[in-house]
């Protein structure tokens, strides 16, 4: 009997030591001197719309003593492409991932599976129709659309009777575009305006979409940076046939079209803040196994030619132009 009790005590002691060793190993890995590696997976990284994003990464990496690896491939067009790249980076030793998700339901489920391996933060956009369950840092897309429409109403003194509007985006199925569109429609309800068409570059029919072939409208509203830049170039070339441009964007080209008078209003999300906060959340998770990452909402600014170079917008323009 005594022998059995002694054996039990020894087993308990050994298990206790093992638990201490495992916890010690976890703490060592999370708080050791080697910096964490964060893989950042985004499309078209050389586009200027990512300038503020990349500058935010640089500053956050310096602040948190973190190695940041940016992965961008021209052929990354589907969620499966994105997942494959993420798996490769995790296999190479990435401790966490920041990703701009390619929105579809299959990709959503695969990202949730990957999050069991390493912490993942989605930036800028999530998934349509239902909550993704992923941690996200993004602006309030609905209110961005609503504020864009509100500026339009202000400029027309609340009277849009007889005015025809065209809405242009790159990905009509993304949650960001869906929410922005709803914000616009809710705000313009009862204004007298008619939305004559709403088209996106990416569509099920694979038909090539361009603004010049759309029915003529009085106002074009572009719901993302690429669409705004394309519409700005069309306005510059008189291919909008006199339509005025309002939209959402965050690149030097977008600011140029506003400053030059080819657009009336630009709503610009703070991409610097988005990625900086993403790194901060991931580092907190890496340093504390029990930390629960938080979704965060970043700010945005309604820019016009009148306030574009004001003191309060200096930092935003600085990060966009980096």
Please provide the spans of the model-predicted regions.
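Venus flytrap/periplasmic-binding-protein-like
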Residues: 121-128, 224-226, 236-266, 304
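Hinge/cleft segment of the Venus flytrap/periplasmic-binding protein
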Residues: 273-322
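Flexible loop/hinge segments that line or gate small-molecule binding clefts
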Residues: 106-143, 251-259
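Short beta-strand segments enriched in small/hydrophobic residues
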Residues: 27-53, 70, 134-135, 163-173
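An alpha-beta-alpha
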Residues: 57, 148-191, 290-310
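Hydrophobic membrane-insertion alpha-helices, especially the h-region
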Residues: 10-25
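Periplasmic-binding protein-like
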Residues: 39, 93-101, 119-123, 166-168, ...
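Hydrophobic alpha-helical segments within soluble ligand-binding/sensing domains
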Residues: 136-162, 250-254, 269-287
